[in-house]
């Protein structure tokens, strides 16, 4: 049996640059892995079947699940149709939260089954396969802190910070946001401000490359968090506004933002102890607002084989 850890991510920067010729949005992002993680276990089977179980009954375990789609793609590319596996998912990352939980689980399937079946694919091979399944999935394979361009699949690693930064995640467990809706709404509201060509896109990429990410504490300025979808989602989602307001009320928070298309929001803290203290401070208000919270350290890797 092989066990794989599949971490969540937050977006430290999500900039919608414009529209691509294929209809997708051109993005410039900084994504960061955190230690809130799902756990997947993989065992060989002799019947050439791919099966998935999960400890969260609300999650679909049918063929539409990214875990099984990733497993099928990897097996197809291997040429060994007789390969089979039983997969069990312990779900810890909230579903539909803007934290790439599904993408990370799919990436974990590629990494875990590559090892279980002894296929020998490189990380680069797995990232290319991941890109066929989802825009966030290559990042989930690589993890750590990455600049992410294109649809999010083009990665450039950012050196890890020497500082023990942490994030306090906050989410209403009853609320989810449709990612396609968020980008459609962004287009409706902001298309007049979109950049028009590759030269303009590259200028913004270069500007992002010049930012010294995750090392803002040398000055009194807050970290340069940005999420263009926050301006779209927050006005129409009370749970996002409540989460941002609560996080912003904590004096120790360095900056706050929504992650991905939401509705999860996070505050950035100088260390895990400060983060946990803030969670304790907010406990009554969080409960009153129906919000759940997680104190998380940053991770320097993506999906990882644990055993």
From Swiss-Prot:
The keyword Ribonucleoprotein does not apply. Keywords: ATP-binding, Isoprene biosynthesis, Kinase, Nucleotide-binding, Transferase. It catalyses: 4-CDP-2-C-methyl-D-erythritol + ATP = 4-CDP-2-C-methyl-D-erythritol 2-phosphate + ADP + H(+). Disulfide bonds: none annotated. Pathway: Isoprenoid biosynthesis; isopentenyl diphosphate biosynthesis via DXP pathway; isopentenyl diphosphate from 1-deoxy-D-xylulose 5-phosphate: step 3/6. The active site is at residues 9, 136. Signal peptide: none annotated. ATP binds at residues 94-104. Belongs to the GHMP kinase family. IspE subfamily. This is 4-diphosphocytidyl-2-C-methyl-D-erythritol kinase. It comes from Synechococcus sp. (strain CC9605).
């Amino acid at each position: 049996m092989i066990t794989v850890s599949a971490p969540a991510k937050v977006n430290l920067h999500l900039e919608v640059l414009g529209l691509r010729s294929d209809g997708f949005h051109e993005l410039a992002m900084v994504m960061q892995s955190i230690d809130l993680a799902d756990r997947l276990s993989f065992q060989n089977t002799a019947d050439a079947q791919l099966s998935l179980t999960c400890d969260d009954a609300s999650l679909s375990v049918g063929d539409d699940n990214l875990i099984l789609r990733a497993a099928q793609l990897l097996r197809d590319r291997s040429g060994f149709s007789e390969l089979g596996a039983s997969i069990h998912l312990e779900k810890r990352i909230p579903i539909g939260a803007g934290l790439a939980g599904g993408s990370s689980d799919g990436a974990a399937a590629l990494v875990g089954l590559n090892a279980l079946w002894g296929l020998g694919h490189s990380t680069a091979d797995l990232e290319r396969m991941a890109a066929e399944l989802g825009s966030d999935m290559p990042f989930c394979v690589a993890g750590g802190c990455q600049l992410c361009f294109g649809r999010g699949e083009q990665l450039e690693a950012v050196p890890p910070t020497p500082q023990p930064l942490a994030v306090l995640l906050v989410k209403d467990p009853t609320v989810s946001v449709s990612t396609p809706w968020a980008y459609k709404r962004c287009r409706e509201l902001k298309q007049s401000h979109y950049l028009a060509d590759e030269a303009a896109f590259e200028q913004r990429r270069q500007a992002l490359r010049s930012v010294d990410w995750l090392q803002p504490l040398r000055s009194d300025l807050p970290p340069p968090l940005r999420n263009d979808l926050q301006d779209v989602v927050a006005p129409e989602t009370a749970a996002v506004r409540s989460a941002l307001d609560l996080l912003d009320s904590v004096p120790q928070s360095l900056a706050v933002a929504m992650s991905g298309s939401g509705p999860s929001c996070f505050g950035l803290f100088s260390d895990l102890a400060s983060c946990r203290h803030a969670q304790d401070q907010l406990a009554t208000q969080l409960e009153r607002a129906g919000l759940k919270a997680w104190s998380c350290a940053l991770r320097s890797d993506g999906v990882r084989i644990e055993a």
